Design a protein with these regions (language model features):
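HIT superfamily nucleotide-processing domains
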Residues: 1-117
Length: 117
C-alpha cells in the first residue's frame, strides 16, 4: 500500500475533511459515504477510504471489498439498488482521477449512457 507524502496528504485530506463527520451518510470501519459536492447524476455518492491511499492500485483487497459493500448499502439507502446504479473508480491521470485519495463514485437516479468516456 502506498501512502502519500505528508504535504500532499494534507492537501488531499482537506478535499474530503471539509465536510463534518455528521455529513457522512454511512460508515464502516475503514470507509464512509458522502454526497458528492458536484453531482454528475441526480444521486452521486462517494465512498471514501478513511486512510489516505493514492489509487485503487495501492489498496488492499479487503478494503476494496469493504468499500464495495458500503457502495451497495448506499445504493439501497438511496433507493437506487433496484432501478440501477453505476460504480466508478477513476484511476490515475488517463482514468480521470482528480483527487488522489481512494474513493468510489456511486451514480444513479437516471438512465446511464454507454460508452461513459
Amino acid at each position: 500500500m502506498l501512502l502519500l507524502s505528508d504535504a500532499y496528504a494534507s492537501e488531499v485530506e482537506s478535499v474530503f475533511s471539509k465536510k463534518p463527520k455528521s455529513s457522512w451518510v454511512l460508515e464502516s470501519e475503514n470507509a464512509y459515504v458522502l454526497e458528492d459536492k458536484y453531482p454528475q447524476a441526480p444521486i452521486h455518492l462517494l465512498v471514501v477510504s478513511k486512510e489516505i491511499i493514492q489509487t485503487v492500485n495501492h489498496a488492499p483487497s479487503a478494503l476494496l471489498g469493504e468499500m464495495l459493500e458500503l457502495a451497495k448499502k448506499a445504493a439501497q439507502k438511496y433507493n437506487i439498488d433496484k432501478s440501477g446504479f453505476r460504480i466508478v473508480i477513476n484511476t490515475n491521470k488517463e482514468g480521470g482521477q482528480g483527487v488522489y485519495h481512494l474513493h468510489i463514485h456511486v451514480l444513479g437516479g437516471r438512465q446511464m449512457q454507454w460508452p461513459p468516456g
